[in-house]
Amino acid sequence: MASQKHSRGHGSKQMATASTYDHSRHGYGAHGRHRDSGLLDSLGRFFGGERSVPRKGSGKEVHMSRSGYLSSSPQRSPYHAHGRHVDDNPVVHFFRNIVSPRTPPPSQPKRGFSRFSWGAENHKPYYGGYGSRSLEHHKSSYKGYKDPHREGHGSLSRIFKLGGQRSRSSSPMARR
């Protein structure tokens, strides 16, 4: 009993910290982190509980958390969610929020891919499989925000720098 609780708590901590890292890396800052902390915690509990609880036969806890989660965020989850997709949809929603501000075109293939890979690699290979790729993605933007030597590497800072300098020197009016 104690080990079951321990593993569930550990799993939710891992998920929550990973998710919070993703948010802070994208520069949402304290405002975004505060607002999403409830969502991240529920996501962490979601996956942490999803892994170990149903095996023991106490699925009532999971259903209660599911219904609570669905009612708290009435986006598209209630539409698609009829059992199996419930645990996929928060992930899809989460990745959509992370991926779309930076790179809108690849968000669609990644959305479908993240669904399958996260479902398949939910146990431990998650770090080696999809996690490594997403971390590489985040590292590049993270360096742009934090590292003063590589300020031009983050996509947002690159846009602002290029747009800020070039739009003043060679504006569309000057070209014509």
Curated annotation (Swiss-Prot):
Gene Ontology BP annotations: myelination
Residue numbers carrying Symmetric dimethylarginine: R111
GO cellular component, one term: plasma membrane
Region (Disordered): 1-176
Modified residues (N-acetylalanine): A2
Bilayer topology term: Peripheral membrane protein
Primary location recorded for the protein, binned into one broad class: membrane
Modification comment: As in other animals, several charge isomers may be produced as a result of optional post-translational modifications, such as phosphorylation of serine or threonine residues, deamidation of glutamine or asparagine residues, citrullination and methylation of arginine residues.
Composition bias type Basic residues, residue spans: 1-11
Modified residues (Deamidated glutamine): Q108
GO MF term list: structural constituent of myelin sheath
Location(s), subcellular: Myelin membrane
Pfam family, one: Myelin_MBP
Top-rank lineage group of the source organism: Eukaryota
Modified residues (Phosphothreonine): T103
Alphabetical UniProt keywords: Acetylation, Cell membrane, Citrullination, Membrane, Methylation, Phosphoprotein
Deamidated asparagine: modified positions: N97
Stated role: Is, with PLP, the most abundant protein component of the myelin membrane in the CNS. Plays a role in both the formation and stabilization of this compact multilayer arrangement of bilayers. Each splice variant and charge isomer may have a specialized function in the assembly of an optimized, biochemically functional myelin membrane.
Protein name: Myelin basic protein
Lineage, highest ranks first: Eukaryota, Metazoa, Chordata, Craniata, Vertebrata
